Amino acid sequence: MDVFSFVKIPKLSSHRTKSSGWPPPSGTWGLNQVPPYGWEMMTNRDGRDYFINHMTQAIPFDDPRFDSCQIIPPAPRKVEMRRDPVLGFGFVAGSEKPVVVRSVTPGGPSEGKLIPGDQIVMINDEAVSAAPRERVIDLVRSCKESILLTVIQPYPSPKSAFISAAKKARLKSNPVKVRFSEEVIINGQVSETVKDNSLLFMPNVLKVYLENGQTKSFRFDCSTSIKDVILTLQEKLSIKGIEHFSLMLEQRIEGAGTKLLLLHEQETLTQVTQRPSSHKMRCLFRISFVPKDPIDLLRRDPVAFEYLYVQSCNDVVQERFGPELKYDIALRLAALQMYIATVTTKQTQKISLKYIEKEWGLETFLPSAVLQSMKEKNIKKALSHLVKANQNLVPPGKKLSALQAKVHYLKFLSDLRLYGGRVFKATLVQAEKRSEVTLLVGPRYGISHVINTKTNLVALLADFSHVNRIEMFTEEESLVRVELHVLDVKPITLLMESSDAMNLACLTAGYYRLLVDSRRSIFNMANKKNAGTQDTGSENKGKHNLLGPDWNCMPQMTTFIGEGEQEAQITYIDSKQKTVEMTDSTLCPKEHRHLYIDNSYSSDELNQPLTQPGDAPCEADYRSLAQRSLLTLSGPDTLKKAQESPRGAKVSFIFGDLALDDGMSPPTIGYERMLEENPEMLEKQRNLYISSANDMKNLDLTPDTDSIQFVANSVYANIGDVKNFEAPEGIEEPLLHDICYAENTDDAEDEDEVSCEEDLVVGEMNQPAILDLSGSSDDIIDLTTLPPPEGDDNEDDFLLRSLNMAIAAPPPGFRDSSDEEDTQSQATSFHEDKEQGSSLQNEEIPVSLIDAVPTSAEGKCEKGLDPAVVSTLEALEALSEEQQKSENSGVAILRAYSPESSSDSGNETNSSEMTEGSELAAAQKQSESLSRMFLATHEGYHPLAEEQTEFPTSKAPSVGLPPKSSHGLAARPATDLPPKVVPSKQILHSDHMEMEPETMETKSVTDYFSKLHMGSVAYSCTSKRKSKLPEGEGKSPLSGNIPGKKQQGTKIAEIEEDTKGKAGTVSSRDNPHLSTFNLERTAFRKDSQRWYVASDGGVVEKSGMEAPAMKVFPRGPGLGNREAEGKEDGTVEGGADDASVLGQGDRFLTDMACVASAKDLDNPEDTDSPSCDHATKLSEAEDNVARLCDYHLAKRMSSLQSEGHFSLQSSQGSSVDTGCGPGSSSSACATPVESPLCPSMGKHMIPDASGKGGRYISPEERAPGHPNHGATFEELHPQTEGMCPRMTVPALHTAINADPLFGTLRDGCHRLPKIKETTV
């Protein structure tokens, strides 16, 4: 016999549908045969019958079919007993409350009077039901002769004779639990009716699904409202910011995914559950009104913040953001979610993709469309790079906590236009004209009109603070007329579908309460009792006949049309409405019915001043309560600027036929496409998300995309045929002629790299409590016994004023990428905000700097320059202007020297780190970066890092050596936010390099580098850098086994002859991917700088120079090879002056330093550098000036004819192939090839076609003899044609282990471009 089996119950299942359920067919429900409705009888293994009450989830043994079985508790009994001298009172009491008689002693005074299990409620005349056990014992012992007990026998049970009272007490405290399944499976199949009916857990019990996978059930009656459920959930989940939450209905539409319907808090649960097709709906508890700043929500309510994160993860995986969520963003979010999941569960910072895939699977973190259309190996490759790049979100030396990662996750998502917003299709009614419009409603956009879906051009219709009330009227069949009353002007009238109208009204009202006034609702559901009585008549026939398939119920309707001949009683008039007569609803010519009429609006609130946080893009012009609307274009970066408030100006309306200014030329705004090598993959990506069945029918799939299953689940853009924002086929919609747009000349933003430089202090906060749900996940909460909710009128006016000032910013302005004035003005204003440590002579000129190495020295800078230095700079500036073409712009390659010195046993050594702007790319889109400033000191020019620069105060020592200082790389994010100082040891290695989403379809990282940087040109130099190597470290030539001295001796003459007199034009292709790629990979990044190169052969304007990263290593105390031979190493380098010349406007002169030897005069090879020898004979002031001038003269001739170029590896400081580690004992670092600090390594770059491309070998590979696993420079850097040969200063090559000319060799600093060279 089975453990559980059905007995005494006639089969009620339908064999045709293979389903069973309640209620049974009429005529077969006999009250005397089976249990009542909601009960089920079972039998246990002992054959005893018990019953399951599905309404209360109770399991009693009592038979509910008979009233006699409802046991009435026995009446209390009074028992008087006399103490026996031997047996006492003859019973044993337990320790429960109330005290229970455990056993009765046979032959004692209590035999026949007390029954085991009796509860002692009184002793003599004292109640002891709640008294402790010790008190009961004392009372019994105090009775010397007799005792009077008042006992009561609890409910009898069939098992009373078989179990003790103590065990019975334990069973009562821990009752038997039965897991109630959500679906009934018959013959291995789930019936459709049971599977789809998930809105009601059972009759009058609503099931609410939470985002964390749990469910809550609520019993309701006809008066239970949505607000009752929300307040109960607020109490159970310990939520403070309940204003962000709402209940929604998720409707599953065949062939069109799902659709979310907002529910008004005044609607009753009875109305919700009586909707047609309710068996295809689920009730969700969601954050529908997202905060503008997730950090603010974290401070106010950690539980709501955690809920928002879980909900956002579900929305990403379930593709609820539609096509707006690009592959790169989806992969970035997945990497963050993987990191959070691993840190939360394993308590480790090390992320393993294998562990993640085994434990959760990639489908837990990525949308199915990404998994289906991308190769698995490319997905894993991208995720591995992105997971490692997550550490770049925090300052170096700090660990990224799970809480910080969640904040960045939500910040990435907040850049999406549909995050917290919705798109609606509507018909604008203006007098007799009707035009189709697309509306965007969200916290940052207010109520905006999407003018062009291709260029994402939107215009602000109304801010939430301007909406007085919302009214809705039935129009024809499922159409509803929505009237938005804005200020005191004519209301905006829209015709919409009923479900969309309800979502628009609820979304607007919800954001109004969140951002403007939490005490007032601009969209109320009128009560039926306030409208008077009105008999149903024939005039109502057909007007509210809402069909099942197309019917989307208006939640605010108090009554609904029934089936058959039933009529609905439709009256929705608020008693506070002053202008509506009670008879209008029946005498209206078009038989319109007022569905929602708001209460009257007080004139005091209308006259409240509207705050304007931030700078208004356009000036408010009040003319008869009419203003100009802000015309703007949405972009990811402008969203950040407009995050504080959805409006930047007071907006009103001019209702006339005024067209949009034709002068607007929207730029191309969109996300960077991925999978470039596969054209058909672009078509896959474009058609990944389909919002209606018609789109699927019209989709022309390529053979490669036939197997892709498209998911139409874009619930935010829930309009079926609405065009996507980025849809290439987007068309310009009819303009709203009743609004006058003002032209705005803001620059366009096209940077989709999200800010990751937040220096969060939230890491020190306590971790938010995880959603703690009391009881089981399916416990039923009886809302019928809840007290009425209290009003929230006790809030003071200060909260209202503060909320009014915190209204979201206007739609982000449209910024023209060709506008340079805005960028310069921003740079100027940025400089004015800086704390000035010294007065600059050219303070008004915005100075662009590739890299800045702030020093740790504190204090104020020297006030002025040496007059000799000033005169020299002016002479060099004049020289630069003579060589500059008047009609062209040049590239200013500014090199910032960071002095660093160390003392070793009295031998003072000096080395200079130089960073060189060496990479040209078309990063015009990132024109928002701010310029750097130079501060003049006696050592030269030091770059002023934005907001974090410390000015060195050290003076030049007697030998002209700068003081030792520590350096760091300033990490420049991809936005205009202040950068952070990154310590020098934090250099991006190839293993930790982030991979852009565009590379997902490339075959390897090197192929992607090659593709990105094809044709990019950078200037390089072949000057040497002094370095030390530990004793005994083996060194070998870069290529072949030929010693460096031999190469030097045989090549000098050839090189000089081959390089003299050759000049050409250097050109490159602008690569749109270079900027965003470098922004994530370099330790220091400048968003976009305009560089101008001056050349005799031709001048080409380039923009978007990315700053190279530089790694600075302090000089080691150990002696190098030269010290071992007894020679002093005290090289003085002119680069220590850090000289930089400020040209006129944006033209700057390239700064370089000549390398001189001050002490190694015994080296005969030093005589080959006349300029450096001359510099050592001058005085201290003249020495610096002379060396600077001589070097510039030589460098000017060399740079005009330079040929070599290098790309990503050079600019990033050997982040790919040098292998410079933070703990490296050698001085290997990322110095550009033509830096004077970089040795030739036995090679010289010449434009001879007979040579072969060189390959770089890192010191880690040379020492143990392992082969180089990195790609060769020829593979990484294809060279464009027309490269200019270079006339160099005599390049003197030295042997690797011999005395170098200008300093010891430096490992890991030599990266060769792809050029031809001659070797011996």
Swiss-Prot record:
Disordered, as annotated region: 809-847, 897-927, 949-981, 1024-1050, 1114-1139, 1204-1274
Record's GO cellular component terms: cytoskeleton; dendritic spine; glutamatergic synapse; postsynaptic density
Segments of skewed composition (Low complexity): 900-913, 1223-1232
Every PDZ domain range: 78-155
SUPFAM superfamilies membership: PDZ domain-like, PH domain-like, Second domain of FERM, Ubiquitin-like, WW domain
Listed Polar residues bias regions: 1204-1217
The WW domain, residue ranges: 33-66
Gene3D superfamilies per record: 1.20.80.10, 2.20.70.10, 2.30.42.10, Phosphatidylinositol 3-kinase Catalytic Subunit, Chain A, domain 1, Pleckstrin-homology domain (PH domain)/Phosphotyrosine-binding domain (PTB)
Main location: other
Location of this chain's protein in the cell: Cell projection, Dendritic spine
Gene Ontology MF terms: lipid binding
The FERM domain, residue ranges: 204-519
Tissue and organ expression note: Expressed in various regions of the brain, including cortex, hippocampus, cerebellum, olfactory bulb and medial habenular nucleus.
UniProt-listed GO biological process terms: positive regulation of synapse structural plasticity
Keywords: Cell projection, Lipid-binding, Synapse
Pfam families: FERM_C_FAK1, FERM_M, PDZ
Function: Positive regulator of dendritic spine morphogenesis and density. Required for the maintenance of excitatory synaptic transmission. Binds phosphatidylinositol 4,5-bisphosphate.
Domain note: The FERM domain mediates the interaction with phosphatidylinositol 4,5-bisphosphate.
Subunit structure: Interacts (via C-terminus) with DLG1, DLG2, DLG3 and DLG4/PSD95. Interacts (via N-terminus) with ARHGEF7; the interaction is mediated by the PDZ domain. Interacts with GPSM2 (via TPR repeat region).
Protein name, UniProt field: FERM and PDZ domain-containing protein 4
Species: Mus musculus (Mouse)
Taxonomic placement: Eukaryota, Metazoa, Chordata, Craniata, Vertebrata
Gene: Frmpd4
